[in-house]
């Protein structure tokens, strides 16, 4: 029997063993999570790698279809870096985390005294492994496994949530809602979404009475800091499309809003609560699924919404605040239960955990402009960083500065 016959027999066996694909999106996400857990079985994988590699683009003989593989699956390298690219053009990843996309901000005038802050997204094309501009969406959240993203259309608040196929670029299906939604966020298992509802577009701006950016002209637009139009949140079962809305009380202190005009909800670490930031202490507020305020979970008591990385995968460590000096950068790693500093790592701002010892952060080169940050990989117990992207250009708020969107691959 020659090599071609061996491959064909192998494909027939694989096709016969595979159960029919169901329509459930959640099943696909869970499959992606199982693939990540099984990555450690390296010996068995190495023994079969040659056959799998040959079989990738070969049609399944019984079905006439091609096996689908994502760009994030084709390159399973621990670190995929492009330190010469800013904004990124090609896939960036470390460990189980990848840069799923990024967005830039722009201010679009709607009248003499009003404007709206808009986002322009570049999303990873899972067919080519490149970041491609997609102007259709105002908000994006990428599911674990990076096959699907939840999206909102440009006009906010939106009355439907789209599930975008990141391989084809097409909408898989729409989930309609009765109340306007302006943000979406996946749970860590990809089975649910929390969608924040607003009565008005939270990205609307008004003309400032002073010269905010110091350029000598009074042409700046700012959010309405004293007002919040947030009304509550939907819990969305992704597989069935069922939704449940809960109202949340206004967050005010002496009749002034203590949340930003856009202050979106996300899930707690274990997915049993939802949370959002506050502009004042205690900096985070948690809610049960009925919209009632509850105490912070014990292992999230010392977290703050301004530090994006939050808990390590095993829950034993938490990302802390900036801990650098006048000429050095650094950030804390703390005990999530006590708030005590356990470690100090490089980095201006900790963005996401890669594993239990490594994180992706914004950081600058020694002596560089504080706004010229690049994505870097930092490791607990090491002063060495590995640059993953090129550096941002311009100062804070300058056109073209990009903001990363991460997801597990």
Residues of each region from the PLM?
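Short loop/turn segments immediately following the C-termini of beta-strands
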Residues: 154, 198-200, 277-279, 323, ...
